[in-house]
């Protein structure tokens, strides 16, 4: 699997812990938990994601978002939809129906299903003419096992593409993944928003 070449070690515990999603299950103490509560998606998150996306926008042929539009108008999804070029294809994968976002004339598509179904998703990508992504954002189920699976999509990351992970502060999957990426192969920003749920980024060297 892709993570086996991109991580410095296996982050799995080979226990039920590997399927835990929430920060409360993780045992990771958020360094700023005394500031709780904060919004699920903060202005700092949105600004950081927009800033990184704009760096690659002009060469970004397609965007993949795992976990779609769960915060209505404040959702990260709208950063991509509002700022992508007209010819850039947006594909969002979510376990729930997000088809209200679909707009083929604007190259906006969603897939209802489990992001673990990679083979099926890739076939849909091919049908849409997508062979690589200039930006991949992972914000689905936050367990260790699921993030390892979702990382498989980075095999389709363009040479100049960026991967973003939300909830890296204390959710187990994103937290342990971003902190164990092989920095000989990847440039890594482990957490640019440490005062909330956090967001991290990686791009190939």
Model-predicted regions and their roles:
Residues 1-137, 141-205:
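A short alpha-helical cap/connector motif
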């Amino acid at each position: 699997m892709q993570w086996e070449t991109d991580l410095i070690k296996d982050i799995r515990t080979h226990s039920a812990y590997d399927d835990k999603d929430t920060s409360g299950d993780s045992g990771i103490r958020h360094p700023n938990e005394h500031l709780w509560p904060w919004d699920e998606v903060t202005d700092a998150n949105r600004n950081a994601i927009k800033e990184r996306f704009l760096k690659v926008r002009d060469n970004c042929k397609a965007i993949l978002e795992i976990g779609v539009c769960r915060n209505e108008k404040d959702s990260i999804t709208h950063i991509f939809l509002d700022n992508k070029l007209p010819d850039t294809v947006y594909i969002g994968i979510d376990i729930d129906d997000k088809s209200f976002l679909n707009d083929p004339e604007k190259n906006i598509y969603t897939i209802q299903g489990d992001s673990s179904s990679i083979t099926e998703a890739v076939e849909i990508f091919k049908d849409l003419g997508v062979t690589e992504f200039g930006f991949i954002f992972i914000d689905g189920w936050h367990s260790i096992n699921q993030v390892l699976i979702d990382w498989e999509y980075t095999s389709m990351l363009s040479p100049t593409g960026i991967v973003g992970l939300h909830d890296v502060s204390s959710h187990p999957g994103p937290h342990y993944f971003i902190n164990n990426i092989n920095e000989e192969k990847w440039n890594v920003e482990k957490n640019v928003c440490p005062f909330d749920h956090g967001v991290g980024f990686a791009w190939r060297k």
